[in-house]
Amino acid sequence: MYTSKQPFLKSKQPFSKSEQPFSKSEQPFRKSKQTFRKFKQPFRKSKQPFRRRPRIGPGDRIDYRNMSLINRFISEQGKILSRRINRLTLKQQRLITLAIKQARILSFLPFRNYENEKQFQAQSISIITGSRPRKNRHIPQLTQKYNSNRNLRNNNQNLRNNNRNLSSDC
């Protein structure tokens, strides 16, 4: 078994080139060119259905007064969306960020969106006051559905217990 502590042993005979030159015409096995064709481009799925139009057109000016453009890059809570979500270049994202901040300072935009803040407020309070931190937060609709299913389960269990009590009394 070879271990790293053993030295590497060199062969005593030097490497020598073969005397016969290599020529392609003397090759014993030749492939026919008709059976195997090399395609210039490898097979790929077309990216056309996933191609999205850019969020900023060539004629759009990135300015704090252009509210229709700025509102596309702000979340429901009033936060500036990341570059990955926006699919913008670095330069465009920087200009959008500056325009949003300028619009906030000049009172064109609120710093927070208070209408949508109420949805997230109840969730954040439960996280702060909870006895243990939760890793995944529930979407309000799913939480409501989950709670209604739990209530139905509890009601069914109570009915079963009542039926057992009634049958045992007889």
UniProtKB/Swiss-Prot annotation:
Instruction: Report biased composition (Polar residues) as residue ranges.
Output: 13-26
Cell location: Plastid, Chloroplast
NCBIfam families for the chain:
S18 (TIGR00165)
Q: What is this protein called?
A: Small ribosomal subunit protein bS18c
Query: Which family would the database say this protein is a member of?
Result: Belongs to the bacterial ribosomal protein bS18 family.
Q: Which organism is it from?
A: Secale cereale (Rye)
Q: Which GO terms describe its cellular component?
A: chloroplast; mitochondrial small ribosomal subunit
Lineage of the organism: Eukaryota, Viridiplantae, Streptophyta, Embryophyta, Tracheophyta
Region annotation Disordered: where it falls in the sequence: 1-60, 149-170
In terms of superkingdom, the source organism counts as: Eukaryota
Q: Which gene encodes it?
A: rps18
Principal localization reads plastid
